[in-house]
């Protein structure tokens, strides 16, 4: 298998100003992508972004590179990542480019691509782009340069798409919901989707200034949303991340409902209505309780590697519809081609309205096993802590001691310099002790 030089598990991501997240690299990346897609014929490429300040700089650089390669460019402005996937497909473009670092702070940014079908870019095209990145840059003749235009009604198109996932006979009258937009890409569209469906909406963190994206808000910092739901006597809260591809929710008591629980609510509703195609795809990090609860409903469950691209690949291979991660990436293939936070939250609300129960009651139908996750910073000392013999021996010993009633998982993050240590089992005190023991050992090996 060819080793990627630039692309990670979810595109290219890093600190702004540090290679490869620089204007110079983005110019070359735009050109390389344009050349790769031009090999398939004339092409149009959509470009969208989240709200971080560096997005404007990188948008200009990509636009110039794409045009230099002879590719036409359609600029969407700040839009959720799944909206860019949807619009790439409906505009019959050859590709879509997202400028975003998702849930990361404002000082990070990144690039990911969608194919013309609104799916993650095939590996062979990524490799073609990588090869072109190392080639000398050329510029098309003036008459062949790409044209650049802006799509002014992109938000309205996506709002209507989201609403189309809700039956026309259904509205959200009587529902009070608090939405936290993380000062990110959903800040315009999400409140309007829920308002137009009839809900009473209280909006948090929808004043982006380029620097406040994900800052103490959104799906990675749920405290303000939890407090607001209780203070407003709302039925629920919905927390999006900065680019709108992951969602967590809060029930009326202020309790967080994570991705595993949301996935179970959607899957159970589909199963009870005879609409579930196949089973459910989770990840190595999915709670054991999800697997057991689905088994009680005779719903098949498989685990993919961590990352929504692996969940999507597993769904495609099995021709299943529903998958996701406990972090809140939820894929509903019956409606969208990628993880879509707004679509997922709408499907949860529809499931609750059909069943006549609250989010708090639905959450309790999934009995989660205690799961402790500790992130250990990995500075890249040259030693792989995950495969280190002493770490492997300790993991084997802990697994044996749990006697089939728990799991141990160590993995390196695909987007950050972290080793994630996860231990799961029936006894929380025991699980925490094991996790802390393993995390300490990993830290020592990393040092």
Swiss-Prot record:
What GO biological process term is on the record, naming one? carbohydrate metabolic process
GO molecular function list? magnesium ion binding; phosphoglucosamine mutase activity; phosphomannomutase activity
Q: What class of enzyme is it?
A: isomerase
Give the matching CDD domains. GlmM
* Reactions listed under catalytic activity: alpha-D-glucosamine 1-phosphate = D-glucosamine 6-phosphate
User: What keywords is this UniProt entry annotated with?
Assistant: Isomerase, Magnesium, Metal-binding, Phosphoprotein
Q: Kindly state what the record says about how the cofactor is bound.
A: Binds 1 Mg(2+) ion per subunit.
Q: For this protein, what post-translational modification is recorded in UniProt?
A: Activated by phosphorylation.
Which residues are named in the active-site annotation? 102 (phosphoserine intermediate)
Q: Which residues bind Mg(2+)?
A: 102, 241, 243, 245
What does the record give as cofactor? Mg(2+)
Q: Which SUPFAM superfamilies match?
A: Phosphoglucomutase, C-terminal domain, Phosphoglucomutase, first 3 domains
- Describe its function: Catalyzes the conversion of glucosamine-6-phosphate to glucosamine-1-phosphate.
Instruction: State the similarity comment.
Output: Belongs to the phosphohexose mutase family.
HAMAP family, per this entry?
GlmM_B
Report the protein name in the record: Phosphoglucosamine mutase
Instruction: Please tell me the species this chain comes from.
Output: Pseudomonas savastanoi pv. phaseolicola (strain 1448A / Race 6) (Pseudomonas syringae pv. phaseolicola (strain 1448A / Race 6))
